[in-house]
């Protein structure tokens, strides 16, 4: 839609795996997008629901050492992959990512698997009037 604009995709390892084959499309068309993969080794939203509503009983929401090496996978498509394992590595990795204007760059950023994201809509109805705004606050 905007070929002259910088495109940054912020995603998680669950969602990126649903369309990881598009790395081939990006190579074919020379699309220099930046992908920031927030990797918590889980289907984050599902795991968070299970933590909050089912006492932390996790069913089919964690990967338990079964994820691919996203850097190697990205590089196998001919793109640039960067692994960020520590918070103090993030700023320099982001600067490198943005500086590579003509390359697709995949930042695989490890995040705490126990960190939750808010606000969070509450199942089963998911109404905007029924959400968690913090671990202990539901509105």
What is the predicted function of each stretch?
Residues 1-139:
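Thiamine diphosphate
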């Amino acid at each position: 839609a905007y070929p002259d604009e910088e495109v940054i995709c912020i995603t998680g390892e669950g969602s990126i795996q649903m369309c990881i084959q598009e790395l081939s499309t990006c190579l074919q068309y020379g699309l220099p997008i930046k992908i920031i993969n927030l990797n918590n080794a889980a289907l984050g939203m599902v795991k968070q629901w299970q933590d909050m509503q089912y006492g932390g009983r996790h069913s089919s929401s964690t990967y338990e050492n079964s994820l691919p090496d996203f850097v190697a996978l990205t590089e196998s498509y001919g793109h640039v992959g960067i692994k960020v394992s520590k918070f103090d590595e993030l700023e320099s990795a982001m600067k490198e990512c943005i500086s590579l204007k003509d390359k697709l760059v995949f930042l695989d950023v490890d995040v705490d698997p126990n960190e939750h994201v808010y606000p969070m809509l509450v199942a089963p109805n998911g109404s905007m009037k029924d959400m968690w705004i913090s671990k202990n606050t539901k509105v």
